Design a protein with these regions (language model features):
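Short acidic, glycine/serine/threonine-rich loops at helix termini
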Residues: 23, 38-40, 44-49, 78-79, ...
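Metallocofactor- and cofactor-centric catalytic cores in central/energy metabolism, strongly enriched
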Residues: 158-159, 187, 193, 202-203, ...
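N-terminal amphipathic, basic-rich helices that act as targeting or association modules
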Residues: 154-182
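Iron-sulfur cluster-binding cysteine motifs and their immediate structural context
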Residues: 23-42, 69, 78-114, 135, ...
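A glycine-rich phosphate-binding loop feature that marks nucleotide/adenosyl-phosphate handling sites
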Residues: 110-112, 181-189
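Single conserved hydrophobic/aromatic residue that forms the stacking wall/gate
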Residues: 229, 236-239
Length: 239
């Protein structure tokens, strides 16, 4: 059972203050906080603990939620620090010589035990809520409506490497080959018996990953690309 629940503090989303920018999900190294756009039918089937923003996703009728997996979160606080609503609240309070009221934050850290009910909402959204192609694009906001194909890795809390790797899988993951160089990425990316790379739940496609020895990943990657091109050429000739 790999949902370790190791974080002392995990994020709590405040739908009343959220501006739906998705910056929190964009910086999350472990894909444990994710935006979802739900149809009325999907929203009706969601667990009672699911929180929704008052306003729908812009220019749609979709219900917006930011789902958090407290049992997968590492407690790095990057989501809290990246939130522009939080930054604005802190700036306003600093100008007044006070501290910001937590009620003015769109996301804040809370003890993990107080957030366990949100696991059901996260699990439901991951399993049952479909992607909405019209919302997906190569922006901070739009990219986060795409399912990440790297999730819940064993990288350290706040790891920038898995943040970038997760984002790349959202942009290109269904047609992505990874020739991994030995290092941190071979530990969080391929430790037996599990892998954090996954497949898109609707297409069944995901990254193809392999790890060569230390400095040989460039040659290994070249071989992978060369054979892929050769196989494609042979397939065309066979038609």
């Amino acid at each position: 059972y790999e949902k370790r629940g190791v974080a002392v503090m995990v994020p709590q989303w405040n739908p009343a203050k959220c501006i739906q920018c998705n910056s929190c999900a964009f910086v999350c190294p472990h894909a444990t906080i994710r935006p979802f756009a739900l149809t009325e039918e999907e929203a009706a089937g969601a667990p009672a603990v699911t929180k929704f923003a008052e306003k729908p996703v812009v220019k749609t009728n979709y219900r917006f939620t930011m789902a958090v997996s407290p049992l997968d979160c590492m407690g790095c606080t990057l989501c809290v620090k990246a939130c522009p609503v939080n930054a604005a609240a802190d700036k306003k309070a600093a100008a007044a010589g006070t501290k910001a009221d937590p009620a003015d934050y769109a996301i804040m850290m809370k003890p993990q035990a107080t957030q366990h009910d949100q696991q059901a909402a996260f699990d439901y959204c991951v399993a049952k809520v479909s992607e909405k192609p019209e919302l997906i694009n190569n922006t901070v906001k739009g990219s986060q409506f795409k399912q990440p194909l790297l999730e819940f890795s064993g990288s350290c809390a706040g790891c920038a490497e898995t943040t970038y790797a997760r984002l790349i899988t959202q942009l290109f993951g269904e047609r992505m080959y990874i020739s991994n160089a030995t290092g941190c990425s071979s530990i969080w990316g391929g430790s037996a018996p599990a892998t954090p790379y996954t497949v898109n739940k609707e297409t069944g496609k995901g990254p193809a990953w392999a790890n060569s020895l230390f400095e040989d990943n460039a040659e290994h990657g070249l071989g992978t690309v060369s054979y892929t091109h050769l196989r494609a050429h042979e397939t065309v000739l066979d038609l």
